Every structure is written in C-alpha cells, then in structure tokens.
Amino acid sequence: MMEEVKRVAEKLTGVGRPSAAEARKLIRRREPENFLFEDDGKTPNNPAFPLVLYRDAVGLPDEFDPAAVIEEIFGANGWGKGWRNGIFDFLHFHTQTHEVLGIASGEARVQFGGVQGRILTVKTGDVVVLPAGTGHQRIAPAQGLLVVGAYPPQGKYDQPKPGEASEQARQLIAHVPAPVTDPVYGTGGPLMACWRDRRD
C-alpha cells in the first residue's frame, strides 16, 4: 500500500525518493571545516567537539526530492528523529544531543557559537554537524530555505536559550558521547576523527 502511495506521489510531483543505493551515489567526499567555540557565559557551546561543516557534500539532482535524499543519507548512517523546516531566527542550543543540519534548498546566513561565534553562509548541499551545546540562529530571512535536521540515536532533544546556560546544562553537554557514525560518511567519516573524545 505504501509503495503504491509513493508511486502516486512521485507521479504527481515529478520527483521521487531515492533508494539507499541511489542516495549513496550522491554523496561527495569533502574535507571538513571545523569551528571550536568557547563558552561565552550565555551560550555554553561544546568544550570538546568542534562544529563540522561539509560544503557541497550532497548532490541534489532534479529527479529526486532533495530533502528525501538527505533524509535517506542521514537515516542510513543511524541519524534519525528527523524533521524538515528552516533554522530558527532566535539563538538556541541543545544540551542532551548533537544535531545535523542538511541544506536541501536555498541558502542562509547563520550565527553559530553564540554572539561571539561565527556567521557562516550555508547553501544547498551543505551539511553542518553541531555538537551538543552549540548555539545557532538564522540571522536574516532566507528565500526558499529547506533544512533537514536529524539526531544520533542516543540523546534527548531540548532547546534552552542563551541565559539558560546553567552549570547543570554544562554538565549535561559534557556527558553527551561522540556519535558512532558520521551522518554523511558513516563509520569511517571525517567526523569520527574530528570528534575523538578529548575528555579522556
């Protein structure tokens, strides 16, 4: 029944959901850009793990729903509980889970790391992996922006705002373990080297 519904939807929209094999072929090997942000007193950020940015990591051909491509890649690598939306225009962070953002369409200027962090422009095909505690906020309206978010299996979603970065929040962040897979490249992905647990 679901396959029939899928075929009808694909016929109506002209775009489809890729198979796991098709999605794998759309992954582009990229060197990560790393950004380690310090606690600024309001946004805790992560003391051990840097934000990892893969530029143009996913090819998004017209034949497939771009968000479905990214969902398939993240899901195949064990990152789930996904959503489709934009990026909030207020500064926030998560204390009990890491998060990955895949840009399915459009572009946006995003402040990462709190008010003393960095403003980065993210575009279609980019993937950003945010360690627990990393502040993030879209700072300007974004035309056509569609983001796919997902989380590793361990962890719990929460959404404190700056000023709520208590000592308890910092303790929670410090205890979120490194994920076992890179959301784009799997077990051997660059994230695994970038996020070697430096707490030991």
Predicted regions and their residues:
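Short, solvent-exposed loop/turn segments at secondary-structure junctions
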Residues: 110-111, 118-120, 137-138
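Short, conserved beta-strand element in jelly-roll/cupin
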Residues: 94-111, 129
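A short beta-loop-beta micro-motif enriched in histidine and acidic residues
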Residues: 86-100, 115-116, 123
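A short, N-terminal "cap"/entry segment at the start of jelly-roll beta-barrel domains
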Residues: 3-91, 192-200
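Conserved metal-binding segment of the jelly-roll/cupin
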Residues: 122-142, 151
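Short, flexible loop/turn elements at secondary-structure junctions
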Residues: 58, 104-105, 114-116, 134
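Double-stranded beta-helix
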Residues: 139-200
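Short, surface-exposed beta-strand-loop junctions and turns on beta-sheet-rich folds
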Residues: 116-118, 144
